[in-house]
Each structure stands twice: as C-alpha cells, then as structure tokens.
Amino acid sequence: LNVGNAKLQKTSSNTSITDGNGNYSIAGATYGVFSDKDCTKQLAPLTTDENGNTDIVEVKAGTVYIKELSAPAGYKVDKTVYSLKVEAGKTATLKVSDTPKVTDTLIELFKIDMETQKDNPQGSASLAGAEFTWKYYAGFYNKDNLPAEATRTWVTKTIAETDSDGTTHYITKLADAYKVSGDSFYMQDGKAVLPLGTLTVEETKAPNGYLLEGAYMQSGDKSEQIKGLYVTQITEDGDLAVLSGSNQFSVSDKVIRGGVKIQKRDLETGDTKPQGSATLKDTVFDIISLNDNSVLVEGKLYKKNEVVKTIRTDIEGIASTSSDLLPYGKFRIVESEAPDGYLTDGAKPIDFTITENGKIVDLTDEAHSIYNQIKRGDIEGVKIGAGTHKRLADVPFRITSKT
C-alpha cells in the first residue's frame, strides 16, 4: 500500500520561561493534517500529550500539510502551515515549537514627595535611590496565600531621568539599568518580560531624607492608596498575556522632619541670665533655608535663602519650633531683633541640619547659643555745696544697682 505515518513533536520555544511553570503546558495542543496547503481538506487530527508527542496517524504517502488549530495552555497559536513529506511504510515526524505568552508591558514606578505630590525632593533629601523588592511566583496567588519562596526575586532602585521637556522624574522598573541585585530577568525577543503568574512589589528602602513608614502607591487615576505589598497577576487574554491593574504608579514617601531649639546668652557673662534691667525675652530669630531644593514649611514652599519661620525667645531666653516644622536639610538661625537692653553685637548666625525624624536639634549649650552684648553707658555726677552751689572736689560717690 502507498501509505505512511505522520506524527508531531511539540516543544516550548522558550524553556527558560516555561520550565517549572504550571501555567504553561504543551499537552492538549490540537493540529490538523491536511492534504492541501490551504488546509481545507483535513485528513486526520493530532493532539499532543504532556511530553508534546502525538499519536501516529496513517496518511497517503506524499506531502501533507499540518497546522495548529488550538494552542495548549499558556502558548500562542502557531499560524504557520508546515509541510511534511511522508514516505510509504515509514513514519515522518514534524518538530514544532510554540511561543509562550508573556507581557513586555512592565510596571513603572515614579517616586514623589508625599506632601507636595511632586517629583521634586525637599531640602537636601533625594528621591533617587529608593529601593523596591519585586517577587515573581509561577502560579496565581493573592496576598493571603503567597508561597514562602518566590520563583524569582529582584531589587531595583529609582534613578533620575530627564524627559524631552527638561522635567526630571525618579523612576524604577524591571530592567538592568535599575537593578541592584537579584535573579536574571525573564527575556523574550531581546526584551525583559514577565511570564504568566503573580508579581508583587514593595518599597523596602526609602531614599535619603525620606521615611519608609507610611509610603503608598497610587495609580494615575489617584484612586486607591496601596500601602505595603502590591500584588498583581499576569493572565491570558486571547493570544496575549496582560497585566491586571495599572502599569504606572506614583510612590509617595514622607520627608523626614524635625525642629530646633536655641538659647540666648549674655556675651560678657556667658550666662543665660540677663544683666541689670535688660531681658533675654523676645529676641527674634529668623530661620533661613540653605537648601538648593524648595522646602515646605507650614503649607508654603520656600526657596534657598528665604526665611521659612520666625521665632521668639521666652523669659528664659529659649526659642523653639515644633518637632516637625522643618524638612530634611540645612538651615541657618539669624538674630533679626535684639532683646530689650542688648545690642545685636556678638550675635553670630548658627547653621544646623535636620537629619532625624521628630528630633529637635538642641542649640542651647554654650558652644551653640547666640550671644548679645549688653548695652552700656557712662554717668557723670557733680557735687556742689548746699549754700554756695560751688562745685566740690574729691567727693566720692557710691553707685548701687537696683536690679
């Protein structure tokens, strides 16, 4: 008889993505064996098993045409029409591979300041260098049933990037330019991709000058604030793999804030007690920003060298701000008005930095206090005789203080 046999063997075109991932299977793919290249006259069906093999079908010797009719789980349908030459009395095997469905639409994270909602850091803080830990799981999970171990893990950081109009953004995503550590990326067609499964991401290190606590992600529509771990899935949608939810998020961090306390002292005595009837109360100090970036103080943005706050001393000569007034950065205290009985002479500016959240920088010791010169004057007395009104020489006077 002029007949032979045809069979098919299927593999994955990208085993680095599909091996060990239960979302992909080469079992269940269906093919048609046709006598014509237009695939209108089907001779027999073929279905792959878990190893990608099909049963043998008997066909007339010659050339047959084979086309995939339905792809197995996780794969794209191969639209190629293959020709297979079958010899009489022999078995011809067609070897084919399917492309796994992946997404190259990866999540982008934009770091912003929580208070200003802008991508400009405050003071001397930075929005670059925030670190995010990404975990991929080869299965579909939610936050409550994630496995203890991820299939792959990556750590990336935010990097400053300037767009065409000169605006700087602080961005991170799953790409080598942002990678700090972790596994190799999944690759297909020269691009970093994500297979079908579950992806989580969480900020694990705040950038310099910001707090990790309270950080949240938000998609472009500014709807839900996502705190802590964000979980999304990559699922099949027709011939594609799609990321559930948004692929762009802003990530807001709260800037570190602190305060300052300053002591007024007498320049001559070095003491915190005034001389005579002078007072250390109501000394006026200006707090000036020394930062290249703007700072937000009491709801208003201030530029470099602008006065951000004015404070006054109490009866003890101490002036203080709240513990959350000033953002992370460098500032200067300048005396703008001396207290009653004192000159501004000797009052030197003091620079200080805010680096710890909720801490008041204490400038009340002798080395950091601001000193003022007491006002001084001379007196002149004339002694005259009671009856003559003549001036008397060499008469001693005693000067006593009433304060």
Summary of predicted features, one role per range:
Residues 1-403:
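Solvent-exposed loop/turn and edge beta-strand elements of beta-rich ligand-binding domains
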